[in-house]
Amino acid sequence: MSWGRKLGKLVQGGEIIGLVGELGSGKTAFVRGFAEGIGVGKEAWVRSPTFTLINEYSGRMPVFHIDLYRVAKPEEQAGLNLREYLYGDGVSLVEWFEYLPAEEVDEYLEISLTHLGGAKRELKFVALGERYEMLLRKLRLEVE
């Protein structure tokens, strides 16, 4: 959660953050930390949108928590109007990011989470695009 919290403090709006990892790898926990960092109040119960597909939270900017687990195929995603969320003023965090068709996003920050046992997780960050490379550099400075 601490990495998510730190990242939530750094975003400016309009970011797309893809979360990749098996069930139980910590994707939703990462979003909880992110929500705290961006100023979503503790009264907002951040939970997986597996069944609602999209949860929206209010912080210093809107946070769109999207879960594509149950809508893995592009034709199943068609009615979600994902582009409105992905390219709006808020920040979109997309669980099961690998299910988003590649043509939907040009630049993004992808975070792969791996459960190592117990409470340990490994996070790998990949920035695609200058904006996200800069964001990742800022995040590194926060944790050093």
Predicted features and spans:
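N-terminal pre-Walker A segment at the start of P-loop NTPase domains
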Residues: 1-6
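Phosphate-binding P-loop
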Residues: 8-14
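Hydrophobic anchor at the beta1->P-loop junction of P-loop NTPases
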Residues: 17-19
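The conserved Walker
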Residues: 23
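Conserved lysine of the Walker
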Residues: 27
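Short beta-strand-centered segment that lines the nucleotide-binding/catalytic pocket of NTP-utilizing
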Residues: 40-56
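Short phosphate-coordinating micro-motif centered on Lys-Gly-acidic
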Residues: 75, 80-144
